[in-house]
């Protein structure tokens, strides 16, 4: 079994995204989003770093005390050097106070307070210098850590608010001022400031004690346009999805208490829309629609989602309403040209939104921190797949998968396709699905949706011919496999991830006598192929099958043995799994609809065992004993004896094969081959079998 360990690594690398037990995206992302989640990050760091970049003429791109101090000294900037020294002292105190595993001692706290008081004193004397904004910010920071919140309110009001120029430093001071207001019980004023600064992280911190419908309802009654409400509504809706997702793992499902909580929220949302006090009814109506859908009222949800599209709200809220309407409509839709057109328009819009929100112009699900690319992903994995499979138009769903994380079409990057969602989806389908997709990319698209997809879908003919041919290899349909594989150039095969295995392993090697495994965990080097091993194999199998059909019994036994070897090697257990698949794992099993190469191997080893030749019979029995379809014994750990306890399975195929092998050996003393007599499994079996 050790020889499979390295290949199991390959499957993790190639298809890790699709493994249930490995890392991978959920594909059940939150759809409800009424603010950019980047707002939950620090809103000031990038602006601060831009200032450092400008100050050093691009030499230092982000805060680095030592590099910045060296630059300031080299420039002769005494004010900046003094400021950086104070800033470093402050940041060190912040880091020390943030330690959760090693809290500061009372002595350390006194020492830190003394340093903060010094920072406060020194910066107060530098409020008319060139760096007055930086020093004023540091002054307020020191006050904050000292708990002097009233001082910060007074300092902002009397000194900063009307006298300091607009800058990132002033915005940070205003943020600290808002925090001081919270400490003084003036939360509503603070919330307005946090909203103005797009500081959703602080809004969340401010609202830590409001999380249920009762709290949200109270806040709405007091302030129907509170800046905290969008955050609280989004949290409630997405928490509801989380609760539903978690309920799938228990027998009781969602509790009746929680269902009532959701129903109460829907009532609140509808009341908020009806009363007309909110400036953002789209927020509430969309929340109501999405909760209705998640909890099973799908037609009502669709009606509500369409109404939400007509209501007022921020641009983000209106986009959110559009996302929810799209998902619900696609989930409910009956296949028709009009639905195709609707879906095309909406998915085009969605892809453009994903590009807009991305900072680097990329929008695939895996490498971008992007809400809209995740919506695209969930749309494809859920309603689009369900809809087009049901409509027997799976090629449309397949084309959509190729848009999630588009594989490279460049020859040197052939390997990228095998780690894509497109490949995973195509691979778990059958050959008819692959043929339908190939026909789609080769044909003339009809309708708006098909044309849009056809322009963007992955269309490598080399990949598709190799893929379809390999699917036929897995079915044991050699002539049809050859027809497709012959169209694939060696240049393509030389770039595949399976190339090292294809170039170094032989399907004629007896797997029960010789293991063909890589020498290390290092990546195997590519091999320049001189022929397509899949075609070579298919032709040999056709030749063997032809000869087997006409051979006499003794000749047929030898041919059957060779045929059995090749069947095993082509199976998911074989060293030449690359003949029928693109990856291998110790967790692999026979796929539905594919040829059972292991069962075929067993059948032909049985035929080989009918030979009168001792060596052939011995090899056949040994091969049968090697195949662990039904193990000859099972082991359980016994804690009392602190050892393994084994129970034999006389009815298993492996037990019977080992019995025949040992019986053959005992009835032919002196003839046993060394590889049999030294086999650990045979030795263990003989101890049990007398």
Whereabouts are the PLM-identified features?
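Sec-dependent signal peptide recognition
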Residues: 2-8
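Extracytoplasmic/secretory-pathway proteins
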Residues: 20-141, 146-690
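N-terminal signal peptide c-region/cleavage motif recognized by signal peptidases
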Residues: 13-17
């Amino acid at each position: 079994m050790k020889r499979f360990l390295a290949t199991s690594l390959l499957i993790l690398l190639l298809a890790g995204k699709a493994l249930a037990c490995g890392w991978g995206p959920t594909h059940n992302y939150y759809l409800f989003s009424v603010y950019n989640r980047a707002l939950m990050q620090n809103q000031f760091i990038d602006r601060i770093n831009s200032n450092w970049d400008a100050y050093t003429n691009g030499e230092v791109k982000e805060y680095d005390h030592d590099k910045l101090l060296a630059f300031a000294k080299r420039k002769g900037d005494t004010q900046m050097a003094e400021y950086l020294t104070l800033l470093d002292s402050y940041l060190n105190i912040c880091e020390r106070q943030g330690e959760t595993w090693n809290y500061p001692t009372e002595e350390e706290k006194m020492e830190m307070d003394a340093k903060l008081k010094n920072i406060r004193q020194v910066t107060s004397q530098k409020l008319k210098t060139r760096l007055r904004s930086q020093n004023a910010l540091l002054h307020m920071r020191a006050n904050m850590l000292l708990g002097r919140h009233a001082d910060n309110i007074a300092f902002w009001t009397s000194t900063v608010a009307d006298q300091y120029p607009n800058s990132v430093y002033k915005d940070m001071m205003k943020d600290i001022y808002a925090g001081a207001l919270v400490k003084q019980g003036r939360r509503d004023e603070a919330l307005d400031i946090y909203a103005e600064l797009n500081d959703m992280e602080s809004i969340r911190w401010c609202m830590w004690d409001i999380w249920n419908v009762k709290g949200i309802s109270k806040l709405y009654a007091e302030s129907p346009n509170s800046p905290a409400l969008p955050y609280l509504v989004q949290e409630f809706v997405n928490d509801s999805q989380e609760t539903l997702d978690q309920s799938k793992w228990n027998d009781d499902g969602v509790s009746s208490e929680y269902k009532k909580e959701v129903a109460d929220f829907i009532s609140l949302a509808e009341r908020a829309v009806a009363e007309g006090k909110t400036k953002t009814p789209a927020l509430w109506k969309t929340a109501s629609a999405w909760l209705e859908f998640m909890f099973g009222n799908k037609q009502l949800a669709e009606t509500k989602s369409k109404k939400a599209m007509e209501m007022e709200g921020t641009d983000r809220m209106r986009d959110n309403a559009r996302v929810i309407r799209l998902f619900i409509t696609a989930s409910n839709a009956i296949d028709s040209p009009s639905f195709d057109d609707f879906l095309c328009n909406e998915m085009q819009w969605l892809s453009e939104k994903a590009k807009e929100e991305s900072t680097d112009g990329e929008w695939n699900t895996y490498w971008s921190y992007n809400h809209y690319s995740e919506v695209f992903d969930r749309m494809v994995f859920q309603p689009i797949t369900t809809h087009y499979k049901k409509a027997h138009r799976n090629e449309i769903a397949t084309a959509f998968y190729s848009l999630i994380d588009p594989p490279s079409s460049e020859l040197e990057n052939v390997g990228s396709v095998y780690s894509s969602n497109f490949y995973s989806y195509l691979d778990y389908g059958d050959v008819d699905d692959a043929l339908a997709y190939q026909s789609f990319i080769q044909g003339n698209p009809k309708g708006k949706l098909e044309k849009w997809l056809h322009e963007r879908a992955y269309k490598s003919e080399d990949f598709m011919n190799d893929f379809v041919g390999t699917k036929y290899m897995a079915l044991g349909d050699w002539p049809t496999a050859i027809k497709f594989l012959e169209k694939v150039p060696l240049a393509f095969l030389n770039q595949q991830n399976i190339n090292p295995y294809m170039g170094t392993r032989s399907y004629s090697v007896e797997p029960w006598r010789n293991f063909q495994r890589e020498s290390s965990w290092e990546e195997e080097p590519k091999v320049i192929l001189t022929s397509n091993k899949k075609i070579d194999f298919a032709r040999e199998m056709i030749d063997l099958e032809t000869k087997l059909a006409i051979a006499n019994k003794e000749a047929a036994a030898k041919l059957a043995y060779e045929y059995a070897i090749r069947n095993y090697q082509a199976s998911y257990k074989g060293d030449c799994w690359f003949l029928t698949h693109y990856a291998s794992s110790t967790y692999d099993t026979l796929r539905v609809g594919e040829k059972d190469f292991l069962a075929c191997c067993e059948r032909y080893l049985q035929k080989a065992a009918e030979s009168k030749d001792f060596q052939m019979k011995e090899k056949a029995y040994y091969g049968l004993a090697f195949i662990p379809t039904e193990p000859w014994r099972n082991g359980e750990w016994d804690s009392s004896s602190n050892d393994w306890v084994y129970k034999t399975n006389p009815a298993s195929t492996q037990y019977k094969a080992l019995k025949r092998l040992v019986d053959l050996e005992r009835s032919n003393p002196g003839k046993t081959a060394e590889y049999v007599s030294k086999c650990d499994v045979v030795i263990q079996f003989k101890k049990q079998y007398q």
